[in-house]
Amino acid sequence: RSVQEAQERCAELRVMIPHATYASYAAVDYLEKVSSIEQLHIHIREGGSMEALDHVLRQGYHLALLRYAVEDDEHYTHYCARRGLKMEPIMDFEYSLLTNRDGPLARKEIRDLSELDKYMEILHDDFQLPGEDGGDGIRWHVNDRRRVHVSERCSQFSILQRMPTAYMWASPMPKRALEQYHLVLRKCPAQRQRMKDVLVYPDRGTLRPEEQTFVQLLHKQAALTVK
């Protein structure tokens, strides 16, 4: 009984998420839920899919949200199945242009990706672009002329807020984040890369209460995004 009581007084969760605003909002929602618990041992880390898998398989993380192209689904499905990881779909989407609400791209429909070359592309500093670095170069458009790598999300949003000619490729976002930074998501007919966000975790029957709570909040935030 004393062990059970100690567990009830301690919330422990280790989760990996991609650079996704809705996922970080879910993490904050979770922290609000558990803020009154006596002890908190929470680790929230952002990174790519392979890093996330490594943290779940080898470093004791409980949950990992993977983000990958739809055409890579079979690879990740087989990879997770061989390693005893359960997969839970969260969201399918296509990237949109994220830009200043009053900027030229907010009013322009991009029919050819070369039209973006005169604007400034903001990228996550650790983002690996499909097709880049020796790949076929087809799966992702890269603005080779005007690129700025930024590692921190708030800095990226501040740049987009201050510079109307800057843009990012972004996944669906919470409406309140768009309003806070005076940004807009614009669908781009020229960019049709389909993506998946899939939650993975060790298949041990049932999730712990902490994990269940986070998963519920993640689904809730995903449903509230602007696509």
Residue ranges, per PLM feature:
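Short amphipathic alpha-helical coupling segments at ligand-binding clamshell hinges
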Residues: 26, 206-218
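Short helix-loop capping/hinge motifs at secondary-structure junctions, enriched
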Residues: 102-112, 190-193, 204-211
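N-terminal winged-helix
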Residues: 8-54
